[in-house]
């Protein structure tokens, strides 16, 4: 088997390259042009980039072997994540690599504003000695407003508490318990802006956060307040910021990121009460080393068949959660395989209900696994855990998930109901030491889903079971086990047969023609 190939398209730390060379053939081309990349990418299984190289939809569609796009850093603005997801390509990054580095840079910019370090430095270099001009303020006793309490925001809290700052936080996702543990006050955005002496931003750029801080927000702030942005350009409306600084609505700003980079022609360049750095928040040797090692290890993990931790376009879980879910991942795959073969027509809807302990767990990966098993047999394009939901959506398949605390005496149950243009099919299953089907179309059974099975709907009348057995015997097909589920004598029933041989389609057709048999299907697991 040939080795995997990895393209390093931007400069990364040598330690990351060394890690990759243990499991793959590594090609380093840190000056590759977009045109060259478009031609070369077809030969690679993974690509590592920083911020220079753009991995566009065009590049992704020219990469039949590509399995992983790795960003040696945090932001993936230069990667078309949707296109990667559609193709089933993992997008991974190294979010923890820059947390401390960016937090320290943010605090450095706060100090630069508070003590007017940048303009004081410039003044001395111009031969001046203007001590009275550069009267600053202490951070001690001031109120810091942090917008976003993720990895970086949390690191800012730890460090600014040492300065003696009072800390307010705006983050809709932080729990009261977590806030109390960190010793911060959670509040709404308006209150934070009104009461903070310094505001620092640590949220991603999304449609919701674009121009989160604009004209109205600056009017809420103290005229002595500073604002710092080391997150993403575009979160602050730079035109509104310029007006707020010119009109004295706030005292100063420090930016490491911009709406356009570099910010050529920006009026902010003219202002003395602005500190600007060229997007270097993550630029320390330690952060670059850590980012390279983290993504290299993630790629190694994938190549060796393991589960990576930092995938942006599929569920990520810790090892304990994965261990708890692993039996149900196998179960969901088998359920999907049964649905794919038993459901007549083209699937239009899939409803999955998680009962018992599973209802409290991270079950998205189970739905993805089931979708993958349903879609793979009917599509020519590859389906995996990453692209299964997007492929289902593209094909107009409605997928819903629900949770239920009751589980009929079992620890956990998965109930999957599929509908198509020609009917429906449902399967209910649990894990009792091994995967077990406990219901078919609402009828109780007890079957281990493995090998070749025949599922038949029939009317529970004398001689019907015998006729099915005889018909199979005529074709040399031996029945290993049989399960029957019924609700009343003489009514509709479901039979699940496990047989020792594959069942030809023509034999199934003969079974379906037997008296009192409504339908039958052969299932291969």
Swiss-Prot record:
Broad class of enzyme this protein falls into: oxidoreductase
Pathway: Amino-acid biosynthesis; L-serine biosynthesis; L-serine from 3-phospho-D-glycerate: step 1/3
Lineage: Archaea, Methanobacteriati, Methanobacteriota, Methanomada group, Methanobacteria
Catalysed conversion reaction: (2R)-3-phosphoglycerate + NAD(+) = 3-phosphooxypyruvate + NADH + H(+)
Recorded GO MF terms: NAD binding; phosphoglycerate dehydrogenase activity
Catalytic residues in the record: 232, 261, 279 (proton donor)
Binding site for NAD(+): 151-152, 171, 230-232, 256, 279-282
Positions of the ACT domain: 453-525
Protein name from the UniProt record: D-3-phosphoglycerate dehydrogenase
InterPro entries: ACT-like_dom_sf, ACT_dom, ASB_dom_sf, D-2-hydroxyacid_DH, D-isomer_2_OHA_DH_cat_dom, D-isomer_DH_CS, D-isomer_DH_CS1, D-isomer_DH_NAD-bd
Residue runs in coiled coils: none
Protein EC: 1.1.1.95
Keyword Oxidoreductase appears in the UniProt entry: yes
Listed PROSITE patterns: ACT, D_2_HYDROXYACID_DH_1, D_2_HYDROXYACID_DH_2, D_2_HYDROXYACID_DH_3
Annotated family: Belongs to the D-isomer specific 2-hydroxyacid dehydrogenase family.
A Pfam family matched in the record: 2-Hacid_dh_C
Key words, A-Z: Amino-acid biosynthesis, NAD, Oxidoreductase, Serine biosynthesis
GO biological process: L-serine biosynthetic process
